[in-house]
């Protein structure tokens, strides 16, 4: 059986705040940096989700808003693929749309153009 590895290296300041997030994947053969990471793991014994959410001081609030919005949309897509629950995934996308509108990331009929004043 083939195995792949994903590795995260987090550099912390003296207050244990992430300064730098680096990650690599054995299949990608390169190392990348990121300002934020969200990891969710299913604990079978506890039947609960374990979460690791980290972001650096360099992550701007507008970037964080976009990061969360895109995660909501990605979760809807993954949920639909994993469960076949089309209607529930639509409801998740609808929530993500309203969330994006509230944060002025998207208009009622789509995304604001990049660089717009919203």
Stretches with model-predicted labels:
Residues 1-8:
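Structured beta-strand/loop patches that form or line metal/cofactor-binding pockets in enzymes
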Residues 19-84:
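Active-site- and interface-proximal helix/loop "cap" or "latch" segments in soluble metabolic
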Residues 1, 28-31, 113-118:
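Intrinsically disordered, low-complexity linkers and terminal tails enriched in Pro/Gly
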Residues 12-13:
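Short, acidic, Ser/Thr-enriched surface-loop or helix-capping motifs
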Residues 77-118:
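C-terminal charged interaction modules
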């Amino acid at each position: 059986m083939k195995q792949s590895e994903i590795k995260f290296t987090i550099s912390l300041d003296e207050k244990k705040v992430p300064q730098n997030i680096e990650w690599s994947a054995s299949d990608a053969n390169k190392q990348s940096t990121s300002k934020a990471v969200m990891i969710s793991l299913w604990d079978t014994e506890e039947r609960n989700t374990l979460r690791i959410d980290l972001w650096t001081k360099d992550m701007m609030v507008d970037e964080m808003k976009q990061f969360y919005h895109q995660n909501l949309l990605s979760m809807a897509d993954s949920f639909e693929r994993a469960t076949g629950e089309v209607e529930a995934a639509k409801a998740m996308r609808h929530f993500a749309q309203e969330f994006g509108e509230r944060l002025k990331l998207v208009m009622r009929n789509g995304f604001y153009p990049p660089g717009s004043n919203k």
